[in-house]
Every structure is written in structure tokens, then in C-alpha cells.
């Protein structure tokens, strides 16, 4: 029995050490927490993380890495930093979870988990979200289906005009929003104080 456990420990150690990998992406920082979901159907959890630099376009706004070897599955550009943590739900019924991630400049994106193609963008390129009083989207959370489309919907906060000086007391309000996960449309929106 002692040899069984010794051999088991040895083979588990070899298997676990073979699963280590690292990946390097040039010229971005991240405040996004890495999240995992199987995006390529191989049974191994893959890693999704947002990135970028405040107020700058990034070619590496959101990246998905293969959980087996750390190779890049796909990446998407972003008009500003994506600092939210991804959540996952199969929105296009292909059997693979899709990615919802958020960040500055009212970026809230739904991305096909398998291909990396954009499913919807709350504020597409070429629009100025601040003109509508919307600023940063923070970490999204799923809630029960509100709009009756059989998909869990998104509860998310929006606010924080970080370009305003810290001493400015007359700030635009924040919003607590319910967003359709299927198409990115606003279902409900409530004004909340912003500090």
C-alpha cells in the first residue's frame, strides 16, 4: 500500500508539473481578474482576461488563452481599458460559453467564446458614452431572466467619471442597470449616487 501511494504521488506530481505554462502579452496592464471557462470544447478550462490602458485604444482589450498550453485562442481590441472580470453564458446556443466583460468608456461586450467574434457591444465604436451620462461599467453579475428570452440577464453598475477632479462635488450620477444578456439592451436603469 505504501508503494501504491508513493507511485500515485509520483505520477500526480509529473502530471501537475506538465500543466504549468505562462504567457506574455506586450504593452498592456490589467486590473481584470482572470476567469476560466472551456472555450474550445476540449474539456480543459481556458483563461479570459481583460486589459488595456486608461483612455487608450488597445489591440489586446480582452484575451482568451488555451488552458492546456497558454497559447492565444483569440483576442479583441477595445477603445479603452477593460478592467471588469468576465462572466460566461452560452448566448448563441453553440454549446460553448460566450464571454461578457466590461470596462471604461461604457464598454460592455459580449464575445463569442469559441471564435472571439463580437456578439454585441453596448456602445459601438464611434459613439461617446459620456454624452449619455454613462461612464465605466463595473463587474457584471448574472440575475434570473427578466425579459423572458430564457437567458439570464445582467445586473451591473455604471458610473465614475474618472476624468473629473476628486474635489469636484457636482458629479454625474451613477446607474444600477439590468441589461439583456442576449442583445445588450437596457431592460431597467435606476439612478444611484456617485462619489
Regions found by a protein language model. Give the residues of each.
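Hydrophobic beta-strand segments that make up the repeating blades of beta-propeller
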Residues: 47-51, 99-102, 154-158
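Beta-propeller blade termini
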Residues: 32-41, 50, 84-91, 138-146, ...
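Repeat-based blade/solenoid architectures
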Residues: 24-34, 77-86, 127-141, 191-195
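Beta-strand-rich domains and repeat architectures in extracellular enzymes and scaffolds
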Residues: 23-58
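A short beta-strand motif characteristic of beta-propeller blades
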Residues: 19-26, 71-77, 117-131, 185-191
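Short glycine/acidic-enriched loop and turn motifs that connect beta-strands
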Residues: 52-57, 105-107, 160-165
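Glycine-aliphatic tripeptides that mark coil-to-beta-strand junctions in extracellular
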Residues: 43-45, 72, 95-97, 150-152
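A short loop-to-beta-strand structural motif that recurs across blades of beta-propeller domains
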Residues: 60-63, 107-109, 174-177
